[in-house]
């Protein structure tokens, strides 16, 4: 799941020439749902969006307050194009969840968002419709979120088990001591003075005209 979060002074959605949704100060969230998204990703994204600190505090300190802290509004718009991959110059959307399934998932996302915050402060567009989204970005401030976050696979129990096994193999290799070839490399070599002097003679002869 991907989200583009923009801090706004106002934002609205128009469908067929009619404004269907609007907010004042707050955040506008463009949400892209992928084929692999589950309830776990949904809940993670809701927490991230609501707790993202993109606002100032009372003293003017930046990046101190979230939309919940400030009791500002949230406008959500479903945006499957965030799951785009390029084939040459042509966008391909095979990673996006199919519309029928995604609509139900998106409604669940909105429900969770409203439950975690204040229902009257969470607005949305119209799923599947051709929309004009008017965003007055404040700053501008635009943050990209992803669930799971890049690199989060390392916290997966299966992945951790693999890493532990790799570490154990390394430790066993160290415990065996140096291999024969490394012993040979580390063994002191006797100096061959004749070879050394011969090599020096070759070099000096190349330098002389």
Curated annotation (Swiss-Prot):
Keyword Phosphoprotein: yes
One Gene Ontology term from the biological process aspect of the record: DNA replication
Chain segments annotated as coiled-coil in the UniProt record: none
InterPro entries from the UniProt entry: Daa-tRNA_deacyls_DTD (IPR003732), DTD-like_sf (IPR023509)
Biased composition (Basic and acidic residues): 159-170, 181-194
Residues that bear Phosphoserine: 197, 204-205
Annotated positions binding Mg(2+): 4, 6, 28
A single GO cellular-component term on record: cytoplasm
UniProtKB keywords: Cytoplasm, DNA replication, DNA-binding, Hydrolase, Magnesium, Metal-binding, Nucleus, Phosphoprotein, RNA-binding, tRNA-binding
Cross-referenced CDD domains: Dtyr_deacylase
Disordered: annotated segments: 142-209
Chain location of the short sequence motif Gly-cisPro motif, important for rejection of L-amino acids per the record: 139-140
Enzyme nomenclature, EC number: 3.1.1.96
Compartments, as annotated in UniProt: Nucleus; Cytoplasm
Post-translational modification: Preferentially phosphorylated in cells arrested early in S phase. Phosphorylation in the C-terminus weakens the interaction with CDC45.
GO MF entries: D-tyrosyl-tRNA(Tyr) deacylase activity; DNA binding; metal ion binding; tRNA binding
Stretch forming the signal peptide: none
Catalytic reactions on record: glycyl-tRNA(Ala) + H2O = tRNA(Ala) + glycine + H(+); a D-aminoacyl-tRNA + H2O = a tRNA + a D-alpha-amino acid + H(+)
Self-association and partners: Homodimer. Interacts with CDC45 and TOPBP1.
Domain topic, free-text comment: A Gly-cisPro motif from one monomer fits into the active site of the other monomer to allow specific chiral rejection of L-amino acids.
NCBIfam families: D-aminoacyl-tRNA deacylase
Record function comment: An aminoacyl-tRNA editing enzyme that deacylates mischarged D-aminoacyl-tRNAs. Also deacylates mischarged glycyl-tRNA(Ala), protecting cells against glycine mischarging by AlaRS. Acts via tRNA-based rather than protein-based catalysis; rejects L-amino acids rather than detecting D-amino acids in the active site. By recycling D-aminoacyl-tRNA to D-amino acids and free tRNA molecules, this enzyme counteracts the toxicity associated with the formation of D-aminoacyl-tRNA entities in vivo and helps enforce protein L-homochirality. ATPase involved in DNA replication, may facilitate loading of CDC45 onto pre-replication complexes.
Family from the record: Belongs to the DTD family.
Protein name as catalogued: D-aminoacyl-tRNA deacylase 1
Gene responsible for this protein: DTD1
């Amino acid at each position: 799941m991907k989200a583009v979060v923009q801090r706004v002074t106002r934002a609205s959605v128009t469908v067929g020439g009619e404004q269907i949704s609007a907010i004042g100060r707050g955040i506008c969230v463009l949400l892209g749902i992928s084929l692999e998204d589950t309830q776990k990703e949904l809940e993670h994204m809701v927490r991230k969006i609501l707790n993202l600190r993109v606002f100032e505090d009372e003293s003017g300190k930046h990046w101190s307050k979230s939309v919940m802290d400030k009791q500002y509004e949230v406008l959500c718009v479903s945006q499957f194009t965030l799951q785009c991959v390029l084939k040459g110059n042509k966008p391909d959307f095979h990673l996006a969840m199919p519309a029928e399934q995604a609509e139900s998932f998106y409604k669940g996302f909105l429900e969770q968002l409203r439950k975690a915050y204040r229902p009257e402060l969470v607005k949305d567009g119209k799923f599947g419709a051709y929309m004009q989204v008017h965003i007055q970005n404040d700053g501008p401030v635009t943050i990209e979120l992803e669930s799971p976050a890049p690199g989060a696979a390392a916290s997966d129990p299966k992945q951790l088990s693999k890493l532990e096994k790799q570490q154990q193999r390394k430790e066993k290799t160290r415990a065996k001591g140096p291999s024969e070839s490394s012993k040979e490399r580390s063994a002191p070599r006797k100096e061959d003075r004749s070879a050394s002097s011969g090599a020096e003679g070759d070099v000096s002869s190349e330098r002389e005209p």
